[in-house]
Swiss-Prot record:
Name of this protein: Elongation factor 1-alpha
EC numbers, comma separated: 3.6.5.3
Reaction equations catalysed: GTP + H2O = GDP + phosphate + H(+)
Residue ranges annotated for the tr-type G domain, each copy included: 4-220
Length: 421
């Protein structure tokens, strides 16, 4: 058993390439799903004419998702290997779920990219790799999945590997840093055991590759940053903000400040899993009570930090963005909604400072008139109402964002510099 070394793992890739099945298979192979649950899912899947979906059913707990055969919200599932305890951040694959992907991937240490052998690099494969790169995921394990569908053909595998390597080159991922694995999540090939169906494949199994990931360094030595997800009023306690600690440590007795609401006080109690704890660390989901703070004083999107070094509030900020899809062009004055940690704020792009080569990061053009899909750029942004952000070089967890408009994610980016209000 691992000594509780923990990894948050994103599972990314195009819709229907087998992400949910892969997650179900990982849970199944590591003994994280009781046998009777799998049997029950099997019966249910067969009744609905979706035989073979039983592993994916493990993931899709919501009835609505089951009916549609689509994974919706980010599902946190856990499994243990020889080296690590993994929490899977199952990243949905459908178009309108990219926002979930961004909030999910930003919580992930590493990612498994699932690419179907019969389909290769698809639009969302491209997009998810782009996002992972922008959001600071360094290690990608690539599962070339559905090998059973292509009769375990080595040439198909090689074709997909070379397509993915080309894609990595375009977004500045080093292809040599990625591990490629020939898998069938459905049949279980090369997930936990080496498969006889792929005698030509001599690389690691998926579980071996996961065990070989580098140890994430929890950002405990950074300043406390805790984006607020919700604020509750609990009788007998009072106002209880809830959120996940991104960096630093929260102790009872700490003096904290909430920004941009600009209120603060002393932490009286901290609760985790309905038990009171003296302190909490990065990755912990906590509810806490602060002396003198009322329900209307703070809101979702506020960030809690130390009173003597409160979270930054941006008057303007400079950011590096990658435009993923926009029907026309983006010019100065454009005001979409920025999603950063738990905040959603309309922000105006005041200026496009330079256009860059997405792969090398070199400047291609100073002060261009516009940017469009596929472009990377540095822009200056003015939030329409106060927004707490940090430069991603200092606190990466509070330095990435998604840009949404017209019901879709049009860009993702990271904060380079904050000009404080």
């Amino acid at each position: 058993m691992s000594d509780n070394r923990h990894q948050n793992l994103a599972v990314i890739g195009h819709v229907d390439h087998g992400k949910s099945t892969m997650v179900g298979r990982l849970l199944y192979e590591t003994g994280s799903v009781p046998e009777h649950v799998i049997e029950q899912h099997k019966e249910e899947a067969e009744e609905k004419g979706k035989g073979g979906f039983e592993f994916a059913y493990v993931m899709d707990n919501l009835a609505e998702e089951r009916e549609r055969g689509v994974t919706i919200d980010i599902a946190h599932q856990e499994f243990t290997t020889d080296e690590y305890e993994f929490t899977i951040v199952d990243c949905p694959g459908h178009r309108d779920f990219v926002k979930n992907m961004i909030t999910g991937a930003s919580q992930a240490d590493n990612a498994v990219l699932v690419v179907a052998a019969d389909d290769g690099v698809a639009p969302q494969t491209r997009e998810h790799v782009f996002l992972s790169r922008t959001l600071g995921i360094d290690e990608l394990i690539v599962a070339v999945n559905k090998m059973d569908v292509v009769d375990y053909d080595e040439s198909k595998y090689n074709e997909v590997v070379s397509g993915v390597k080309d894609l990595f080159g375009q977004v500045g991922f080093n292809p040599d840093d990625a591990k490629f694995i020939a898998t069938s999540a459905f049949e279980g090939d090369n997930v936990s055991d080496h498969s006889d169906n792929t005698p030509w494949y001599d690389g690691p199994t998926l579980l071996e590759a996961l065990n070989g990931l580098p140890v994430p360094q929890p950002p405990t030595d950074a300043d406390l940053r805790l984006p607020i997800q919700d604020v509750y009023t609990i009788s007998g306690i009072g106002t209880v903000p809830v959120g996940r600690i991104e960096t630093g440590v929260m102790n009872t007795g700490d003096n904290v400040s909430f920004q941009p609401s600009d209120v603060g006080g002393e932490v009286k109690t901290i609760e985790m899993h309905h038990e009171e704890v003296p302190n909490a660390e990065p990755g912990d989901n906590v509810g806490f009570n602060v002396r003198g703070i009322g329900k209307d004083d703070i809101r979702r999107g506020d960030v809690c930090g130390p009173a003597d070094d409160p979270p930054s509030v941006a008057d303007t900020f400079q950011a590096q963005v990658v435009v993923m899809q926009h029907p026309s062009v983006i010019t100065a004055g454009y005001t979409p909604v920025f999603h950063a940690h738990t905040a959603q704020v309309a922000c105006t792009i005041e200026s496009i400072d330079k256009k860059m080569d997405p792969a090398s990061g070199e400047t291609q053009e100073e002060n261009p008139d516009f940017i469009q899909s596929g472009d990377a750029a540095v822009v200056t942004v003015r939030p329409q109402k106060p927004l707490s952000l940090e430069p991603s070089s200092e606190i990466p967890e509070l330095g990435s964002f998604a840009v949404r408009d017209m019901g879709q994610t049009i860009a993702a980016g990271k904060v380079l510099d904050v000009d404080e209000a």
